[in-house]
Amino acid sequence: MTRSHDLFKAAQRHIPGGVNSPVRAFKGVGGDPVFIQRAEGAYMYDADGKRYIDYVGSWGPMIAGHAHPEVVEAVREAARGGLSFGAPTEIEIRMAERVCELVPSMDMVRMVSSGTEATMSAIRLARGFTGRDKIIKFEGCYHGHGDSLLVKAGSGALTLGVPSSPGVPAALAEHTLTLTYNDLDEVRETLAHVGGQVACIIVEPVAGNMNCIPPVPGFLEGLRELCDEYGALLIFDEVMTGFRVALGGAQAHYGVKPDLTTLGKIIGGGMPVGAFGGRREVMEQLAPLGPVYQAGTLSGNPVAMAAGLKTLEIISRPGFYDELTRKTRVMVDGVLTAAGEAGIPMTANQVGGMFGLFFSEQPVTNFYQATQCDLDRFRLFFHEMLERGVYLAPSAYEAGFVSSAHSEADLAETIEAAARSLREVSGN
């Protein structure tokens, strides 16, 4: 037995399911979760001291690697001045200025403490600004665990939303319409019927919660045009893609400007931070300027702002994203080659330092196609890679991430581990 096994048993006595976020429980792959003791650079070390090359990166934030010395020092310096004040600080201004500089669609920004809080607040703001109640989201896109967003599709595009979790009132779910990602015709048809009631369309510009699925050409542009036509706000959930696929986020990468943007993960440099922002006339509806209420005790926490600002400084350095994209492509291409040599069908998607591997013969562009991939092979592959010291997301529906800390040797070791793992999975 491992120490992780013992810790998981102990955790289940006082923590529901033994984890504080469900995907960590390894339900999607089976077995006991790995309990992490520490991390540095591209590596994590479990409670037994085993080293893993990490492609989860705390689900995205660790773009510069774990415990980056400059980020750690920024946190130490900020902490010496106090952990939290519940009052305005200068560092909040610096963070807001930098975010608005990097993401030109954001005239103003409000800091919060998580991505979920950012999306919940952005939707409330969109409803308050437009005076409408309905929202459109897409199947397979995850926007946090707010009640309005834990809704699945009904039996057809125009049906009312259905709660996907107990505790979500049906009356609230009715206002959420869940459509097919990358299907602009379905959006157009829906808006033709209820467009005057829709406050916003919220979308992950690159879906990262049905693995990694980029938008098909014209999809984001079409959403922008339809929102303009029907007077709805377009919200880009860039909690995952913000500062990950490009310095200006997916909106810069694809050249589409939303009305509101939600951010998280990288903006906190590993600390719990979220943000939402956008057009000035929309953001000015927020209290204390306007009637839409939003607040938070730890919003703009000075230690978290210090970590985030230093991370933004690091990723703004020349060549950062070119190198990150190159490294990701080297790793993905190497794994695909290994799959081909093992006779295992596999496709992949990549945008910048974000990637997805699918056990499928066909390209994957939406949630249904993602569910048709070979989940049993993924589970076997995951555990083979874990045994060989490569830590992938413990779910076939989660994107992977490369950091600037991954070395050429790390990439080569990963590709070799994949080749051995895929041969084992294939039985050859």
UniProtKB/Swiss-Prot annotation:
Q: Which gene encodes it?
A: hemL
Family according to the record: Belongs to the class-III pyridoxal-phosphate-dependent aminotransferase family. HemL subfamily.
Q: Where in the cell is it found?
A: Cytoplasm
Q: Which GO terms describe its molecular function?
A: glutamate-1-semialdehyde 2,1-aminomutase activity; pyridoxal phosphate binding; transaminase activity
Q: Which Pfam families match?
A: Aminotran_3
Q: Which UniProt keywords apply?
A: Cytoplasm, Isomerase, Porphyrin biosynthesis, Pyridoxal phosphate
User: What are the N6-(pyridoxal phosphate)lysine sites (modified residues) in this protein?
Assistant: K265
- Organism, as annotated: Thioalkalivibrio sulfidiphilus (strain HL-EbGR7)
Example GO CC term: the record gives: cytoplasm
- Tell me which InterPro entries the record gives: 4pyrrol_synth_GluAld_NH2Trfase, Aminotrans_3, Aminotrans_3_PPA_site, PyrdxlP-dep_Trfase, PyrdxlP-dep_Trfase_major, PyrdxlP-dep_Trfase_small
On the tree of life, the source organism's domain of life is: Bacteria
> Which pathway does the database say it acts in?
Porphyrin-containing compound metabolism; protoporphyrin-IX biosynthesis; 5-aminolevulinate from L-glutamyl-tRNA(Glu): step 2/2
Q: Which residues form the signal peptide?
A: none
* Cofactors, names only: pyridoxal 5'-phosphate
Xref: PANTHER family? GLUTAMATE-1-SEMIALDEHYDE 2,1-AMINOMUTASE (PTHR43713), GLUTAMATE-1-SEMIALDEHYDE 2,1-AMINOMUTASE 1, CHLOROPLASTIC-RELATED (PTHR43713:SF3)
Q: What catalytic activity does the UniProt entry give for this protein?
A: (S)-4-amino-5-oxopentanoate = 5-aminolevulinate
Q: How does it assemble?
A: Homodimer.
Give the EC number(s) listed in the UniProt record.
Answer: 5.4.3.8
Entry keyword annotation includes Ribosomal protein:
no
Report the protein name in the record. Glutamate-1-semialdehyde 2,1-aminomutase
Q: Which GO terms describe its biological process?
A: protoporphyrinogen IX biosynthetic process
